[in-house]
Amino acid sequence: MSQTVHFQGNPVTVANVIPQAGSKAQAFTLVAKDLSDVSLSQYAGKRKVLNIFPSIDTGVCAASVRKFNQLATEVENTVVLCVSADLPFAQSRFCGAEGLSNVITLSTLRNNEFLKNYGVEIVDGPLKGLAARAVIVLDENDNVIFSQLVDEITHEPDYDAALNVLKA
């Protein structure tokens, strides 16, 4: 199965399907800014916001990290995981320069399966191999309680919808 999103108005194909509310999140291991492996299970008992995007070096992606850094202070027992294919060095540099300390950046550097398993792998077009823009919210038991695959990659996600699920 696949889905279609758009990049600058042009259709691009995304492999698989984003997890839907009510489904169980798949386990994953990604790379932290210190190059250590970080697993989903390390956040057991906390709610998770997965802010998934192509690259921190684009304006819209950077804006989403800044916004989720701010929103992270508004919800309890919640971690915000910002996931991209960027090298951990770039993620760390960006967050350090911006003074962002309420989000955790994770890289798909050693795990391209994450993109496939979470239905965000762009498989054609100029962004082939990167992640489509998506937000997935998990409860304390890793059940999906909200997901959004953003139709136009150059647009920001629906922050209010994700926040409302966490405040419900």
UniProtKB/Swiss-Prot annotation:
Active site: 61
CDD domains noted in UniProt: PRX_Atyp2cys
EC number from the UniProt entry: 1.11.1.24
SUPFAM superfamilies assigned to the protein according to its UniProt record, in alphabetical order: Thioredoxin-like (SSF52833)
Keywords from the named record: Antioxidant, Disulfide bond, Oxidoreductase, Peroxidase, Redox-active center
The keyword Oxidoreductase belongs to this UniProt entry's keyword annotation: yes
Pfam families: Redoxin (PF08534)
The organism's place on the tree of life at top rank: Bacteria
Annotated ranges, domain Thioredoxin: 19-168
Gene3D superfamilies per UniProt: Glutaredoxin
Disulfide bonds: 61-95
Record GO terms (molecular function): thioredoxin peroxidase activity
Reaction catalysed by this enzyme: a hydroperoxide + [thioredoxin]-dithiol = an alcohol + [thioredoxin]-disulfide + H2O
Family, as annotated: Belongs to the peroxiredoxin family. Tpx subfamily.
Function: Thiol-specific peroxidase that catalyzes the reduction of hydrogen peroxide and organic hydroperoxides to water and alcohols, respectively. Plays a role in cell protection against oxidative stress by detoxifying peroxides.
Additional detail: The active site is a conserved redox-active cysteine residue, the peroxidatic cysteine (C(P)), which makes the nucleophilic attack on the peroxide substrate. The peroxide oxidizes the C(P)-SH to cysteine sulfenic acid (C(P)-SOH), which then reacts with another cysteine residue, the resolving cysteine (C(R)), to form a disulfide bridge. The disulfide is subsequently reduced by an appropriate electron donor to complete the catalytic cycle. In this atypical 2-Cys peroxiredoxin, C(R) is present in the same subunit to form an intramolecular disulfide.
Subunit description: Homodimer.
Protein name: Thiol peroxidase
Encoding gene, per UniProt annotation: tpx
